[in-house]
């Protein structure tokens, strides 16, 4: 899976649509706090790296942390954590790239079973441990690239037994108006 980041365009559109700037600032502050604990707290380091799915080379770092290697005594581990933190802080400060912990970048597909109603979507995501979970409730869906306020929608994620085989994608309905498929 790919983690979700808000970029300048999406932040601008969400702000235009009424999302308070304080929301973005709070998310940024929480991320900076987590990154500051990266070098001092093992749990923060593992959580930050796993959540952002930093790539294959960082799996080794997570395995070393879980195995109990000391961050301040292992030069490779320390340098990898510092590089990860520097890259993440750079993304936040210079590119306004805000990590969304519960967000995902998903490919959209059509509900061939015709189970979903207009305004509903089906989302089932996988975790790093291989477990699956179905998302339910209101979700914010944005097209990429996101250039127009209509590219951001709030839809309702529902469970559908006939779509359980669909993983790490967002399933749009074939019923009703096609705006939520063609405009997203």
Predicted region positions:
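Core mixed alpha/beta domains of very large multi-subunit molecular machines
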Residues: 1-184
């Amino acid at each position: 899976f790919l983690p979700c980041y808000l970029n300048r365009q999406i932040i601008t559109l969400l702000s235009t649509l009424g999302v308070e700037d304080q929301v973005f600032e709070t998310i940024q502050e929480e991320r900076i706090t987590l990154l500051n604990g990266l070098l001092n707290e093992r749990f923060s380091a593992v959580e930050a790296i796993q959540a952002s799915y930093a790539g294959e080379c960082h799996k080794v770092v997570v395995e070393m942390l879980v195995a109990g290697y000391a961050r301040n005594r292992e030069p490779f581990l320390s340098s990898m954590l510092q590089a990860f933190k520097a890259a993440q802080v750079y993304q936040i400060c210079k590119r306004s790239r805000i990590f969304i912990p519960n967000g995902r970048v998903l490919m959209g597909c059509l509900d061939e079973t015709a189970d979903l109603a207009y305004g509903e979507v089906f989302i089932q995501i996988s975790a790093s441990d291989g477990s699956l979970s179905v998302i339910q409730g209101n979700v914010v869906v944005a097209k990429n690239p996101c250039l127009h306020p209509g590219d951001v929608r709030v839809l309702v994620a529902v469970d559908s037994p006939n779509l359980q085989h669909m993983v790490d994608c967002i399933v749009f309905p074939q019923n009703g108006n096609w705006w939520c498929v063609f405009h997203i």
